[in-house]
């Protein structure tokens, strides 16, 4: 069983930073960043089929793992959690093996080292936010390609008090909002919410805070009107803070998550990428089919192998998985893991509007056609 300290959570706002306009300019920094990653990263034993091995760019994706078997190194930006339910089930139930791909998984401290690993060739793919991917492409010329959309909804929410609820972006005017960090995806999402109602960023003060149920005391004391959390945390808050109410950002903001690969990785290892995605899609379909039972089979299998905190609470686990399933299938069951040009462009255009991303960039060049 993979045990995870419940306090071991990395801020999802530790996002893409620095300048890497080309793979050549980037690669020196990447080597050091991923060396640190490999020394302290978490290898999710059993999530893939291959044991932990050391290696350079050639190990990221290849056909050298055995006759007819492809290999893929994937970097996650968060420690083990329910957000990776499809990837875990793909390993547990043999979807990777069925599709002829041997998977090695590492964990990085946020998107920056994960993307660096992809660009250096040390990893084949990573999963990160659509908004942050587009900002990296537009502002820093990151030569990355979105090869699949996973979730298709903005993954955040603003929690507030039922006695003074924040239910729509216009309610934010003049209200102090807590954010996990400055300049990250959470703050950018807040700016997108504000813009959607015609307000200015100056209309909504913000301060850096935590994002746990304990942070709600700042709302009770009147120091905050609300603060940003992960939308998958809403059930946890409902149980711990009965006075809490929520404004999910997906009602107002175009965002989601995608798998990204480098241009070289996509060109040289398209078959490995497609095989990996086919395995994850099969696992997604199985989890979706388990909805009628309240995801009982899925949760049982995960508990047999993993020990992260959200699995210990039945209602929280069900709510988290259901949020993911709803997000995977927003565009229909037939669109699982398919890229969507309209959604990609809409997210970029919204980011340009609030000056979160440089305008005039042809981001469609960085979107792969559907691979599964």
Task: Give residue spans per PLM region.
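Bacterial signal peptide processing site
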Residues: 48-50
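N-terminal secretory signal peptides
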Residues: 1-25, 34-45
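Short, glycine-/small- and polar/acidic-enriched structural segments
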Residues: 54-210, 221, 225-231, 243-251
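Pocket-lining segment of extracytoplasmic ligand-binding domains
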Residues: 214-307
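Stable alpha-helical elements in mature extracytoplasmic
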Residues: 83, 92, 111-114, 132, ...
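Hinge/cleft segment of the Venus flytrap/periplasmic-binding protein
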Residues: 346-372
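Secondary-structure end/capping motifs
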Residues: 269-354
């Amino acid at each position: 069983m993979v045990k995870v300290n419940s306090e071991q959570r990395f801020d999802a706002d530790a996002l893409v930073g620095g300048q890497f306009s080309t793979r050549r300019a980037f690669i020196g920094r990447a080597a050091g960043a991923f060396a640190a990653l490999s020394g302290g990263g978490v290898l999710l034993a059993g999530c893939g089929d291959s044991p932990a091995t050391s290696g350079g760019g050639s190990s990221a994706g290849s056909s050298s793992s055995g006759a007819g078997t492809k290999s893929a190194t994937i970097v996650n930006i968060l420690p083990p959690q329910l957000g990776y339910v499809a990837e875990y089930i793909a390993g547990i139930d043999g979807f990777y093996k069925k599709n002829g791909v041997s998977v090695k998984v590492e964990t990085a401290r946020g998107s920056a080292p994960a993307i660096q690993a992809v660009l250096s060739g040390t990893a084949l793919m990573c999963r990160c936010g659509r908004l942050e991917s587009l900002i990296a492409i537009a502002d820093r010329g990151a030569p990355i390609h979105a090869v699949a959309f996973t979730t298709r909804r903005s993954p955040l929410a603003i929690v507030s008090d039922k006695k003074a609820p924040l239910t729509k972006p216009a309610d934010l005017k003049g209200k102090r909002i807590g954010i996990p960090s400055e300049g990250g995806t959470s703050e950018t999402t807040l700016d997108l919410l504000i813009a959607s109602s015609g307000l200015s960023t100056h209309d909504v003060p913000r301060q850096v805070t935590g994002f746990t149920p304990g942070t709600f005391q700042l709302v009770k004391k009147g120091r905050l009107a609300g603060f940003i959390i992960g939308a998958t945390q809403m059930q946890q808050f409902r149980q711990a803070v009965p006075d809490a109410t929520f404004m999910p950002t997906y009602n107002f903001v175009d965002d989601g998550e995608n798998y990204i690969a480098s241009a070289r990785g996509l060109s040289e290892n398209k078959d490995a990428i497609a095989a990996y995605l086919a395995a994850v899609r099969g696992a997604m379909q199985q989890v979706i089919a388990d909805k009628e039972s309240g995801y009982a089979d899925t949760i049982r299998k995960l508990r047999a192998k993993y020990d992260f905190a959200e699995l210990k609470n039945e209602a929280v686990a069900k709510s988290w998985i259901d949020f993911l399933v709803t997000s995977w299938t927003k565009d229909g069951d037939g669109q699982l893991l398919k890229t969507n040009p309209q959604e990609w462009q809409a997210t970029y255009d919204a980011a340009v509007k609030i000056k979160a991303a440089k305008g005039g960039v042809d981001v469609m060049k960085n979107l792969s056609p559907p691979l599964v």
